[in-house]
């Protein structure tokens, strides 16, 4: 069984790079676990610990031989250990990655680019999550290489607190996004007046 080498390059600071080796068996297809800092839909109460964020997310998949979501799960399964951004917002980043990857990629040479530009309302359990007024600008490159295959992920998430208005209605996000999370349904409410505004409930 081949050992997979994972090299993480931290681009949060352009002058700084960080690497972290790891290994995983090829036949291991575990899904991500849902981020525990999010409040389950049935526990949603009032507006406590809610934060509105205008999200600009971009995930670029670099692979000369194509890729599958199984490989992406291999890369992302240890995301908690290699994440280089603000840890109060790691759950937000996970959800943005999942939602971005549920969309249609735009080819860019031998690469595929997934983009997400939405306004979400997040609610965190207890006192978890970002502070009032806190924002995020996160960028990181994750590379997966087993000497026979190479897949790189370039992740960029910008989250700025903002305000949205209008009535909302319930929808379910593309199930492909949920494939990255075990036993998790990404349920949202979307504004009738603004198709890019959603309330992320779970």
UniProtKB/Swiss-Prot annotation:
Task: Please provide the record's keywords in A-Z order.
Answer: Apoptosis, Host cytoplasm, Host membrane, Host-virus interaction, Membrane, Viral budding, Viral budding via the host ESCRT complexes, Viral envelope protein, Viral matrix protein, Viral release from host cell, Virion
Per UniProt, what does mutating residue 2 to D do? Answer: In strain: Isolate SAD1-3670 var 1 and Isolate SAD1-3670 var 2
Q: Which InterPro entries match?
A: Rhabdo_M, Rhabdovirus_M_sf
- Consequence recorded when altering residue 58 to G: In strain: Isolate SAD1-3670 var 1 and Isolate SAD1-3670 var 2
Mutation effect (residue 168 to I): In strain: Isolate SAD1-3670 var 1 and Isolate SAD1-3670 var 2
The question of whether Membrane is a record keyword is answered with yes
GO biological process: one example = negative regulation of viral transcription
Q: Which GO terms describe its cellular component?
A: host cell cytoplasm; host cell endomembrane system; membrane; viral envelope; virion membrane
Can you say what this protein is called? Answer: Matrix protein
Natural source organism: Rabies virus (strain SAD B19) (RABV)
Tell me the gene name.
Answer: M
């Amino acid at each position: 069984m081949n050992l997979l080498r994972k090299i993480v390059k931290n681009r949060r600071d352009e002058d700084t790079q960080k690497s972290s080796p790891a290994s995983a068996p090829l036949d291991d297809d575990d899904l991500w676990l849902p981020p525990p800092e999010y409040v389950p839909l049935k526990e949603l109460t009032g507006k406590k610990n809610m934060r509105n964020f205008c999200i600009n997310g971009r995930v670029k998949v670099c692979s000369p031989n194509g890729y599958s979501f199984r490989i992406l799960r291999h890369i992302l399964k240890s995301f908690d250990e290699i994440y280089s951004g603000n840890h109060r917002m790691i759950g937000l980043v996970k959800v943005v990655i999942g939602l971005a990857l549920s969309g249609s990629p735009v080819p860019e040479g031998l690469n595929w680019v997934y983009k997400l530009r939405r306004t979400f309302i997040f609610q965190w359990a207890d006192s978890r999550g970002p502070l009032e007024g806190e924002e995020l600008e996160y960028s990181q490159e994750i590379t997966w290489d087993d000497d026979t295959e190479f897949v790189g992920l370039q992740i960029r998430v910008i989250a700025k607190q903002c305000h949205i208005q209008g009535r909302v209605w319930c929808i379910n996000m593309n199930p492909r996004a949920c494939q990255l999370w075990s036993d998790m349904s990404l349920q949202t409410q979307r504004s009738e007046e603004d198709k890019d505004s959603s309330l992320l409930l779970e």
